């Protein structure tokens, strides 16, 4: 559970409760064991909740007309995470790019969240044997020319 409080937005780092248990455990691991900042852990948490919503919609676990933000990200177990394929990840990246309008850098960060989560499930807690994100590379970033001050 995050102990960081943002005085301007007190609910931002509230205890991580509206996600699947594996995600909650992973976010706690990030903060306590991996030493990530509260902001980093919170961003990974949001990314993984978004992926949970996407997968619930993709697998038909919610009505097709359900509003994306209204999909409950809870209720997914370790067996569900083990059923995710590389194609599911590719579809999620496509969704982020086309439907959500994410830039390549945002898509890459969300993919990094998934890489970390699956690395945790496979290598840290040994709950899964396969990582569907292992062979997926982040999108190629646009080269930005430096802006010189005159």
Task: Kindly give the residue locations of the regions a language model identified.
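N-terminal core-binding DNA-recognition domain of tyrosine recombinases/integrases
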Residues: 2-13, 23-39, 48-145
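Catalytic-site neighborhood detector that most strongly recognizes the C-terminal catalytic loop/helix
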Residues: 148
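A detector for short, charged/polar N-terminal pre-domain segments
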Residues: 14-18
């Amino acid at each position: 559970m995050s102990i960081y409080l943002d005085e301007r937005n007190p609910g931002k780092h509230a205890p991580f409760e509206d996600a699947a248990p594996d995600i909650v455990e992973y976010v706690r691991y990030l903060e306590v064991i991996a030493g990530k900042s509260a902001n980093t852990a919170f961003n990974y948490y949001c990314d993984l909740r978004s992926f949970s919503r996407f997968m619930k919609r993709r697998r038909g676990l919610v009505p097709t007309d359900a509003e994306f933000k209204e999909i409950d990200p809870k209720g997914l177990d370790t067996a569900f995470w083990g059923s995710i394929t590389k194609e599911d990840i590719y579809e999620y990246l496509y969704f982020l790019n086309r439907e959500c309008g994410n830039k390549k850098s945002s898509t890459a960060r969300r993919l990094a969240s998934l890489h970390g989560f699956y690395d945790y499930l496979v290598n840290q807690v040994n709950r899964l044997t396969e990582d569907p994100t292992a062979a997926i590379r982040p999108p190629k970033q646009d080269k930005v020319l430096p802006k010189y001050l005159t």
